Amino acid sequence: MTMQVDPSANSSAASSAAPGTTVDRAEIEKFSKLSQEWWDPTGKMAPLHRINPLRLQFIRDAACRKFDRNARSLNCLAGLRLLDIGCGAGLLCEPFTRLGAQVIGVDPSASNIAAAKLHAEKAHLSIDYRCTTVEDMDVRERFDIILAMEVVEHVADVGLFLDRCAAMLKPGGMMAASTLNRNWKSFALGIVAAEYVLRWLPRGTHQWDKFVTPDELARHFERNGLGITEQSGVVYSPFGDRWSLSSDMDVNYMVVAEAVG
């Protein structure tokens, strides 16, 4: 079988988004179809389960440094309001709730939110899940920590999305985001390898031209008075079959942004 993949085939040209919105309906439909698979560590969400401990560690440690907490404490985030935007079925909401945070998880997919509520109920966790979008939230709500993990490459308007996120951040708060860099290496590894060769992800999960470079992300933050204070790449090693944090941000990467000045 001949495999042909072109970056232009992974284009957002056919985006089903209306002007002035962050919502891409095609993206919502794509992830809604996976709603029953979010919590299966061996299913289509397996890659997310593999990197989830690294995401949790990166955000927890940054938050503990920011808010002067002991990262070894089981309740290290007690008293902090955390908003997880594009929460899916709650893979980050649940561990952060266990760390003591008051967690609000939002997702535009009703089926994702239903799966999240059901799993939280079975785990006896109290999490405020809402089927909504960032632009439909009340901007008067304020949060100590806002997460946008593996989300910005799926929204229709990255600038508008981050503007709305920043508007809900408390003074002295922090925002964490993760996405994929945009270059030929990320196309080769993030799309060709992950979706076509290794088949870690369903084909069409990502669109290469919607990946966001660290410089682009930094400019969006700067426009909102935020600066990147921490950053890390997330890399896979076939030797040992494991993911780890790295200074290599060519493909997957995470950042923390805080108010500057």
From Swiss-Prot:
List of residues binding S-adenosyl-L-methionine: R55, G86, D107, M149
Ranges where the record places region Disordered: 1-22
Pathway this chain belongs to: Cofactor biosynthesis; ubiquinone biosynthesis
Any Pfam family matching the protein: Methyltransf_23
UniProt cross-references to SUPFAM superfamilies, sorted A to Z: S-adenosyl-L-methionine-dependent methyltransferases
UniProt-listed Gene3D superfamilies: Vaccinia Virus protein VP39 (3.40.50.150)
Bias (Low complexity): 8-18
Catalytic activity: a 3-demethylubiquinol + S-adenosyl-L-methionine = a ubiquinol + S-adenosyl-L-homocysteine + H(+); a 3-(all-trans-polyprenyl)benzene-1,2-diol + S-adenosyl-L-methionine = a 2-methoxy-6-(all-trans-polyprenyl)phenol + S-adenosyl-L-homocysteine + H(+)
Keywords: Methyltransferase, S-adenosyl-L-methionine, Transferase, Ubiquinone biosynthesis
Keyword Plastid: no
GO-annotated biological processes: methylation
Domain of life per record: Bacteria
Enzyme class (EC, first level): transferase
CDD domains noted in UniProt: AdoMet_MTases
EC number assigned by the record: 2.1.1.222, 2.1.1.64
MF term (GO), any: 2-polyprenyl-6-hydroxyphenol methylase activity
Family: Belongs to the methyltransferase superfamily. UbiG/COQ3 family.
Functional description taken from the UniProt entry: O-methyltransferase that catalyzes the 2 O-methylation steps in the ubiquinone biosynthetic pathway.
Name this protein carries in UniProt: Ubiquinone biosynthesis O-methyltransferase
Source organism: Nitrobacter winogradskyi (strain ATCC 25391 / DSM 10237 / CIP 104748 / NCIMB 11846 / Nb-255)
Gene for this chain: ubiG
